[in-house]
Amino acid sequence: MDTVLNNINQSRYFNDSTANTKIEEIKKHLDSPSDADKLESMKKLIAMLSKGRDVSEAFPQVVKNVIVKNLEIKKLVYMYLVHYAESQNDSALLSINTIQKSLNDQSQVIRASALRVMSSIRVIDIIEVIILAIEKSVKDTSPFVRKAAAFAIAKVHKLDCDKQEPLIDLLEILLNDTSTMVLGAAIVAFNELCPQRFDLLHQHYRKICQLLADFDEWSQVIVLDILTKYARSQFRCPDSTMNDKNIKQFKKKSKSFYSDEEDQEDDEPENSLYKKKPLERDMFDSSEEIDMDHRLLLKSTLPLLQSRNNAVVMAVSSLYFYCAPSIEAQKVGKSLVRILRSGPEVQYITLTNISTMVTLRPSMFEPHLSEFFIHSSDPEYSIKLKLEILTRLATPENIGKILKEFKEYVKNEDKKFVAATIQAIGSCASTVPDVTESCIYGLMSLLSNQSTVVVAESVIVLKRLLQLNATNEKLEKLEKEKEKEKDVKENQSTISKHSSSNNSIKYDNIILHLSKLLDTLQVPSARASIVWVIGEYCYRVPLVAPDVFRKLVKSFSDEHESVKLETLNLGSKLYVQFTDNNSTTTTDNSIPNEFKNERTKEKITLMFQYVLNLAKFDQNYDIRDNSRMLKHFYFNTENTQSINSNIKQIVINQKPIPTETSISEDRQRFTLGSLSHIVNHTALGYTALPDFPDVAPDPSVREPIQRWIPNQQSQQQQHQQQQLNNIFVDTPFYSDEEEEDEEEYDEEEEEEEYEEQNEYEDFFGEEKKNKKKNRKQQNYDEDEYNQDIDDGEYDGEGEVQAEDEDDFDELFGITNDDNNQTANGIGGGGSGEEEMDKFDFENYINSTTKSVKKILLKPTISGGLSIDYCFIRIRDNEEFSCQPRYNIIQLNIKNQSDETFTDISIINKNLIDGADISEFDPIESIEPNQAIQKQIYVLFNSTSQSCKFEISFNKGNFPVTLTPIIGELLIPIVPIYESISQWKDEFEEVGEFKQVDDQFEFGDQCLDKLNNNNNNNNNNNNESGDENIGLMPILPIVLEGINLIPIASNKLKSKIQFASKTLLKDENIYVQIQLLKQQPPTVNCIIRSNDQVVSALLLKKLKDVLQK
């Protein structure tokens, strides 16, 4: 009851009064300190947004509320940001810093929502930042966040397909997850990212099958579709006849509709197998030889037929239809019939799929025939599909039941429904020849109906049935003659009996009845059908056909085009019958006496010539062409003998058996359940099912990787020992330490919220409030503290104090007069502020003027020409040899072959907007083993998009790619001041900076440098210079990887600060590296800049350099 009242209360936000609320009033409430006012305003905004109103005006106020603690407000803010992320890219980017910080929030809901918002911002410039966030989220402890990371991978791939390879690496991590929530989302991302990479699924196939029932229902739909394609490509066809349309499948015993035995095999008597055809026995036995993994798939998906989600039931049905043996595919029929009772949309989709299934395997739905009977409430589309299904299910055993139902349908007042039923009757008569005669006479009774629509449809169907019956008579006579030659008396009697039943149809009475309808029936298609029937069987009614032709000639000019064409054909056939006295009719060997009447022959000839002359001037070109052709056949003076000898074979020939075309048969080319199958044409993104392989691939690829499992006995012993230890340790339920941690966390959250609030107020032009922010102090355990004291790295009196982390004090190590805290970590200077000294950078900047060399063109690809390159670094005060923002790249071109290469140049540049390459002058020739250096100037205009071009020479053109390196998109700022305090004043003029930071351990390369340095210091009795203390041993590694310049450091060189600026946007960047612990060596990296994209990329680059 409370939920209902709450929903009613929430609906008030969508009424007209709320939707017309002024934006200014909402903006005022969003700036209110009350969470209740903010929540009310956000609900109004979302309601207005959902009704199509533009509320982007409130964006600045909404963004500021990202930092609030209230979870419901944050959810609404994120919903707002997702909506405007794509249409207002610049505005959405304003919140990227806060969203990044939310990725570290304690709440899993906030972390997942932040990632969802970030991945929804479709700006390619921040794609690297999004990928970094995904890399962090895939390793999150919460499955809810990892699930959001999986969906974010799919979004990033849609934004930039070039990032597929790194995204696949992240996807592999998620596929190894054991949480069904994450695994289902990962497979959905797999379907968007690389649906053909089945090699990624081999190791996880059995796990997916076993956990399939635990996935969420919408993930199950995607997973079932992928497993269907996987089974079709990895397993052999379980039934060699499953694609044969003309073979009836084995029929299972009919059970009650709501049966609990749906997932069990029916027990049949042992003597039931002898009743089956040999083909059906093979089909039944083939299921026993199915692959074990194939059997696991079928067994795991069968329970999903009872899912409440209709899409899941449809996906399982599609899987069984395409991948299961024919005998087992019949199990899905009952479930599909069950979901027919859902809404009209579901009913249409289900009936469309059933109509396609029935064309191939009618036995799947024969036990449920009555479920397809039409109800008075069925819509028109449902009626047509049900009638088609009923005709496909018609057999000699149930045709009586179906025709009895059709008899009631033709009495309906809806004439379109009756016309569709008449078509279904004709289809049943074609499928079951035994009822053709009764159907024909039943349709004859409908010719007296008052509705022209019913009469016209009856005539059209009668035409088809008469043609079909006449064709069957000819085939039976030919078969009878063959049997006579073989003297098989039993077969002769059977055929004669069947022929006599068919010959009982009185064509003359039917044609006579149809001819009378021409005087009243005005439907063109029906009139054309009657004329065709009279012309086709004119030898049966030699007196009626000429009179009908006479009436049609009189009204020829007023007839429809289709009737005119059939009139010409009728005249042609009558002329041939009356003029060819030596010929025989189609079915009789004797010529009727009426065709020998000369007077009638003369009248037919005159009427035929008259109608040919009328058709000669008709507006329709088909009628004109037909009249000229017939006139050339019958009244041509040249070569008359050669034409007359074949005229009868042309005009009066044996017609093929009429075939019915159905849209369901045309839909067979598309996969069941797909959008293309419904609309009957290839929709965007459709991929067809692969064919079964002739030889199954190696099944060993699906063997899971063996993991180390500890000894069970040792595990039990450890568990028992742990229980004994817990008995003697008296630990309170909530320890004091945990309570202190919670209090500290709450204080930190309040301080960060206040800090970010001030930041947004400054950003949007509000009054700046000069208040310092205090952060959580960094505490280290007692062992690490004692270790640091023993190593002689603390100068204090036994008390380690935390560092004041004000924006600039944290960067430069300078504190205010009222703060007595010292920097924490190696190099802390006791009580008082930590002094920073100017760094002597000249010895380092000169040694890193070039970056590490990289390969641009391999000689194995180009036939002997190798090209590697490196970035030429410049300082801020150096003059550019080209335009600003360009990188200088030095190419080392070498001929490693035995022949001379000529005309080496750069062609076919493929660059993004704003990018440019100033190529070198063409090289006329380069001798074997000769090396040449060239410089090019490149403007990348992006931190992630590559520059693509081709190297051309006499061997051909070879595509190459220059990728921007974030460490080379910087220019060091050369200090020109004498003291650090002057630098601080200079930096303060720029404004407040945004910051990204991370703590991590050193990699092997840096550890080796530090260890070697410590060993050397011990051997030299600690008398080495400054270059061997603190972070100095790894400084060359940092400068080699990133184009920075060191500005200042503390005395122990455990904290070093760098400065640089971006090449593209000319934004200052400040970097600090601080050594925190020695065991294990841990470093803290801080990067501050207004360019958040570069900051995030630079932090990742710095982390990669230090963790090598």
From Swiss-Prot:
Question: Which UniProt key words apply to this protein?
Answer: Endosome, Membrane, Protein transport, Repeat, Transport
Could you state one GO biological process linked to this protein? vesicle-mediated transport
Q: Where is the composition biased (Basic and acidic residues)?
A: 480-490
Annotated Gene Ontology cellular component terms = AP-3 adaptor complex; endosome membrane
Residue stretches of biased makeup (Acidic residues): 736-764, 780-797
Q: Which intervals of the chain are annotated as region Disordered?
A: 480-501, 736-797, 811-835
Q: Name one Pfam family in it.
A: Adaptin_N
This protein's major location comes to membrane
The subcellular localization recorded is: Endosome membrane
HEAT repeat start and end residues = 90-127, 327-363, 397-433, 434-471
The answer to whether the entry has keyword Membrane is: yes
Q: Which SUPFAM superfamilies match?
A: ARM repeat
Gene3D superfamilies, A to Z: Leucine-rich Repeat Variant (1.25.10.10)
Q: Does the keyword tRNA processing apply?
A: no
Q: Tell me which family the UniProt entry assigns to this protein.
A: Belongs to the adaptor complexes large subunit family.
Describe the function of this protein.
Answer: Part of the AP-3 complex, an adaptor-related complex which is essential for the compartmentalization of the endocytic pathway.
On subunit structure and binding partners, the annotation says: Adaptor protein complex 3 (AP-3) is a heterotetramer composed of two large adaptins (delta-type subunit and beta-type subunit), a medium adaptin (mu-type subunit) and a small adaptin (sigma-type subunit).
Name of protein: AP-3 complex subunit beta
- Origin species, per record, is Dictyostelium discoideum
Lineage, please?
Eukaryota, Amoebozoa, Evosea, Eumycetozoa, Dictyostelia
